[in-house]
Design a protein with these regions (language model features):
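Helix-to-loop junction immediately C-terminal to a conserved catalytic motif
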Residues: 75
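Conserved ABC transporter NBD signature motif
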Residues: 83-94
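Signature (C-motif/LSGGQ) region and adjacent switch/coupling loops
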Residues: 36, 95, 115, 149-152
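Catalytic Walker B motif of ABC-type/P-loop ATPase nucleotide-binding domains
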Residues: 177-180
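Short coil-to-helix segment of the ABC ATPase nucleotide-binding domain corresponding to the Q-loop/switch region
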Residues: 112-120
Length: 282
């Protein structure tokens, strides 16, 4: 495990163009009182491009520290004050189909069926109806919802709604998937199931994922690498490599290797005096 104070090249494979590279990112906004608030300050991080296996990186930090702000900038939903965001070496200048985002809140269209929700992005791209239906059903099958293709969102549980959101994102085959605390509103049992589902589905798709959470256990269970952020304004304080890559299941959370990394993060966060704002785990 490594923990540099600044991570300008952390996670890059030697000689390869990183999937994501952020250089000296600064983001501010004006609050309701008219005061300028610095949300992100000099963030540098790199997520490797690992063809054939994918990569899952986690932004871990206290609530309100700027994690979601960074994600929105990568997605192109907001413009940074300064700095550079590169996807596969190309600068981000706005939204695009190369990035897909899954939010914590449920974002399905209530009047469309589950299948029609998943088809929505393909419909905007002008994909023929028969092909849209085929692809949507394939991804619904992957997330275990093929039998609910003709249901409406109001008939689904919270976990099922998030599965719809995941299928709707992946069917567009983005180069990078951005996930903003997608399981934060779920009960513990559903949350565990969704964590396992994410690992299974995303590995099959060879996706690069940037996942935001303030749950330490979730971060260690999901991540190949973890970027620890400070209080607002967000800075990258440490980067942790998670040394195991296979057989990630609920039993792993009781293993010595898992507990060692979890405790290491707890000690780190305690030393930064942010533990009170970070969830220890479920």
């Amino acid at each position: 495990m490594s923990e540099p104070d600044k991570a300008p090249a952390a996670g890059a494979l030697q000689g390869a163009v990183p999937k994501l590279e952020i250089q000296d990112l600064f983001i501010s906004y004006v609050d309701r009182a008219g005061k300028v608030v610095q949300a992100v300050e000099g963030v540098n991080l790199t997520v490797a491009n690992k063809p054939g296996v994918g990569e899952l990186a986690v932004l871990l930090g206290p609530s309100g520290c700027g994690k979601s702000t960074i994600l929105k900038a990568i997605c192109g939903l907001l413009q940074p004050d300064s700095g550079t965001i590169l996807i596969d070496g190309q600068p981000v200048s706005g939204t695009g189909r190369d990035r897909g985002m899954v939010f914590q809140s449920y974002t399905s269209f209530a009047w469309r069926t589950v299948r029609k929700n998943v088809e929505y992005g393909l419909e905007l791209q002008g994909v023929p109806a028969a092909q849209r239906q085929k692809q949507a059903l394939e991804f619904l099958d992957q997330v275990g919802l093929k039998d609910f293709a003709d249901a409406h969102p109001k008939q689904l549980s919270g976990g099922m709604k998030q599965r719809v959101a995941i299928a709707r994102t992946l069917v567009n085959k983005p180069r990078m998937v951005l996930m903003d605390e997608p399981f934060g509103a779920l009960d513990p049992q559903t949350r565990w199931g969704m964590q396992s589902l994410i690992l299974d589905v995303l590995r099959k798709q060879d996706n690069t994922v940037l996942f935001v959470t303030h749950d330490i256990s979730e971060a260690v269970f999901l991540a190949d690498s973890i970027f620890v952020l400070s209080h607002r304004p967000a800075k990258v304080l440490h980067r942790i490599e998670v040394p195991y890559f296979e057989d990630r299941n609920v039993a792993l959370k009781q293993s010595q290797a898992f507990k060692q990394i979890e405790n290491h993060l707890l000690d780190m966060l305690q030393s930064l005096e942010v533990r009170g704002n970070v969830r220890v785990g479920l």
